[in-house]
Amino acid sequence: EELRGGWPEKVLTMQKNWIGKSFGTEVVFQVVENNTDLPVFTTRVDTIYGVTYAVVAPEHPIVDEILKANPAIKSAVMAMKNMDVIERAAEGKEKNGIDTGWHVKNPYNGVEVPLWIGDYVLMNYGTGAVMAVPAHDERDYAFAKKYNLEIKSVIFPKEGEIVLPFV
């Protein structure tokens, strides 16, 4: 499958040779503040009950709507947009986020969770939006710990104590 968005040849090569194609499903969350759909791509729909927040890329179209309601975060969003895409996606890079004050509703259980803008979410991968399950994903876990977000386990080991993130 072709990548959209004029990616540098280096990124295209990494996608083809290292990352490979991701298989998963699209889940549609509802944005509470403007009653619009926010599709997210996930490879682990089995963890949907552990979603404690959602994150969109700074280039995501919903960000324009958020900025109309909250112009105070515009400079922080612009700084994220101006970062190098390879740097943003780098393994081990600290993840940075902006709390939008908005929420999305989990379509499986109706729970409303905060919506963030994150520099590590890329618009040209999946839908540009992530359902965050910090108990079962290392990136989500690091982000949740940094910003003191809820961590909810939904998968447990057969024996012993759970060590987070349990992936």
Model-derived segments and their meaning:
Residues 4-26:
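Short, Gly/Pro- and small/polar-rich lid/capping loops
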